Amino acid sequence: MNKIRKWLDKIPWYTDEIHSILMYLIMGGFTTLINIVTFWLCTYVLNWDYRIANTIAWVASVLFAYFSNKKYVFESYTPTWKERAREVTSFFGFRFLTYLVDILVMILLIEVLSINELWAKIWTNVIVLVLNYVFSKWIIFKVKK
């Protein structure tokens, strides 16, 4: 990753902010892929209820997201247990909040608007992706000056 970053840093308009957004889109893409594939497997292969499948997909993707966001997106350094505990609890707390948005939007799209489960999942992921970036950037992994 460092070799790529060094190469990208040679581009005059490539800033830390652009790097953070680009890395969030890449890692967010992987997180979304994990979420959708897990949801699809649980719903269409295992034939589980979409709410259970959504919860399992959420757990799998949030675990991946924490480590990828910490290391590659926000390059967060937490030297003390207290800082690490604050970061972990705020990350999972805000992700739980967006999980509630996720499940409520899924229910609305599927049961009220009769949208296909997989399409509902994809649209819901767009909403959740934006909310998670805002929470991560300005609250969870906020750089102290």
From Swiss-Prot:
InterPro entries: GtrA_CellWall_Glycosyl, GtrA_DPMS_TM. GO terms for biological process: polysaccharide biosynthetic process. The keyword Amino-acid biosynthesis does not apply. Its main location: membrane. Keywords: Cell membrane, Membrane, Transmembrane, Transmembrane helix, Transport. The chain crosses the membrane at residues 21-41, 52-69, 96-116, 121-141. It is a multi-pass membrane protein. It is found in: Cell membrane. GO terms for cellular component: plasma membrane. Involved in the decoration of cell wall teichoic acid with galactose and glucose. Belongs to the GtrA family. This is Cell wall teichoic acid glycosylation protein GtcA. It comes from Listeria monocytogenes serovar 1/2a (strain ATCC BAA-679 / EGD-e).
